[in-house]
A protein has these predicted regions:
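N-terminal auxiliary segments of SAM/dcSAM-dependent transferases
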Residues: 1-70
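Residue-level signal for pocket-adjacent positions within structured domains
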Residues: 34, 64-65, 70, 75, ...
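Short, glycine- and charge-enriched coil/turn segments that flank and shape catalytic ligand pockets
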Residues: 47-51, 103-110, 131, 168-172, ...
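An acidic site on a long C-lobe helix of protein kinase domains
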Residues: 49, 89-92, 216
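SAM-dependent Rossmann-like transferase core, predominantly class I methyltransferases
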Residues: 55-129, 134-147, 272
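S-adenosylmethionine
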Residues: 132-133, 137-275
Length: 276
């Protein structure tokens, strides 16, 4: 089987043509190590045994996210291990990291990443900001194992701890930066989402009740009001539908200089606020 045959199989299974080609390229390059020239000229079986290829094709035909099939996802120009126990890193979240880096490079801040998942935010900030002291929390043991795999393979200096964002410890004045991409998709938004996200990615990392969309943000903002140093900064990835409520909540919580930033698609995706 060759590249053109494989992407056509996926296209016939229901993928759009562009998506079928992109998924095929990611599988062949990131899992099988094929170059563009290899894809044009070589049989895939030269780089993978027939059984593995058959299993991978079957998984993709069932719309398993290609990142889970490959076991890797790109984030800020690095390959991170991903498995179904963590969310697949999104390009939008890269912009959140870049905002922190813009503000704090090269000042060696103390950083906490709440809800670290794969560890992509924590590892990126630890590697990109010299001298940064980075802690990371998650409540999922499976996510913590994945994050630690990434931290070790990338040689990032990050301390990962099991901690519930809704019941945090009583830290005071410990961090210069707290960053989080918590669950923020309302249950009612499920019907507009891709089926493979709903079927394969962990729902506890995605969804919040319709009647309490700011559940995690309020808890984290309260914790940050105690644990940030004076002038420290809180950064969130947010649901664009809730940006006004987020600004109001942070203002009411005593934060200053509350700023919204759009993502690459023009949606109000990020917010930062400064502890007075």
């Amino acid at each position: 089987m060759r590249y053109n045959e494989l992407w056509r199989i996926l296209h016939d299974s229901g993928y759009a043509e562009g998506e079928a080609k992109a998924v095929t390229r990611m599988l062949l390059t990131d899992k099988y190590g094929m170059t563009t020239a290899d894809m044009l000229c070589e049989e895939i079986e030269k780089y993978s045994d027939a059984h593995t290829l058959s299993e991978d094709v079957s998984a993709l035909k069932a719309f398993t996210p290609v990142q889970y099939v490959v076991g890797k996802a790109w984030f800020c120009d690095r390959l991170f291990t991903v498995r179904p126990g963590c969310l697949i890193p999104r390009p939008e979240t890269e912009e959140l990291c870049r905002w922190v880096e813009e503000d704090y490079y090269p000042s060696a801040p103390a950083i906490l990443d709440i809800g670290t998942g794969s560890g992509c935010i924590a590892a990126t900030l630890a590697l990109d900001i010299p001298g940064a002291k980075v802690d990371a929390w998650d409540i999922s043991d499976e996510a913590i194992a994945i994050a630690n795999d990434n931290i070790h393979s990338l040689m990032a200096d990050v301390n990962v701890t099991r901690c519930d964002a809704l019941n945090p410890p009583a830290d005071v004045g410990k961090y210069d930066v707290i960053v989080s991409n918590p669950p923020y998709i309302c249950d009612s938004e499920r019907r507009g989402m891709e089926a493979n996200v709903l079927e394969y990615e962990p729902p506890t990392a995605l969804f919040v009740p319709d009647d309490d969309a700011l559940l995690f943000y309020r808890a984290i903002a309260h914790y940050a009001s105690l644990s940030l140093t004076p002038g420290g900064t809180l950064y969130f990835e947010i649901n664009p539908l809730c940006h006004s409520e987020m600004c109001s909540m942070l203002d009411a919580s005593g934060y200053v200089d509350v700023l919204i930033r759009n993502d690459q698609f023009g949606k109000k995706r990020f917010i930062k606020a400064t502890k007075r």
